[in-house]
């Protein structure tokens, strides 16, 4: 399984510039920021990892992210090197993305569909979506929680709950579910 999200997970990753506020950034904002060198992929990835740490397991404990890719910062560094050399793979090069936990990826992240029955389920291939994202240089940041089995358990199951990640909280009203 990929690295479990924890408060001390990124202690060694001290930002070299003031922390990047990623809350309001759209994809076009991110692409423009990377292309104009306003921030690096490492800055962006670090900011998202720090935000996951602050909101997912600690703070309001949203349970939105099941695991993070321990290689994310290394991949961000490689993207920054490509951009510095003027050879990014695509406009998405260096953009961190979360995958829903039912999408296969051949890295250190298990694909569980939110079920403890699939903990440790490692695949040897990327789904076509993930292969395309990787070819573009996007960084698989981690796996997002989902309704267990993508809510194909029953017609009366709780949306946003999985045995691996727990119940995803609504970030705006914490005592309500996200769905």
What is the role of each PLM region?
Residues 92-179:
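Short glycine/serine-rich loop/turn segments
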């Amino acid at each position: 399984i990929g690295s479990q999200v924890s408060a001390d997970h990124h202690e060694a990753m001290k930002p070299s510039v003031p922390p990047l506020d990623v809350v309001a950034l759209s994809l076009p904002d991110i692409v423009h920021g990377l292309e104009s060198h306003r921030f690096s992929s490492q800055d962006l990835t670090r900011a998202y990892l720090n935000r996951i740490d602050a909101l997912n397991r600690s703070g309001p404990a949203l349970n939105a992210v099941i695991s993070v890719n321990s290689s994310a910062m290394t991949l961000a560094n490689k993207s920054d090197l490509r951009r510095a050399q003027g050879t990014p793979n695509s406009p998405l090069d260096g953009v961190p993305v979360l995958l829903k936990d039912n999408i296969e990826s051949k890295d250190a992240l298990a694909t569980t569909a939110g079920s403890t029955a699939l903990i440790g389920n490692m695949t040897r291939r990327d789904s076509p979506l993930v292969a395309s994202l990787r070819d573009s240089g996007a960084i698989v940041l981690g796996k997002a929680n989902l309704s267990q089995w993508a809510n194909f358990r029953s017609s009366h199951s709780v949306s946003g709950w999985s045995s691996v990640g727990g119940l995803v909280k609504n970030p705006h009203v914490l005592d309500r579910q996200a769905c």
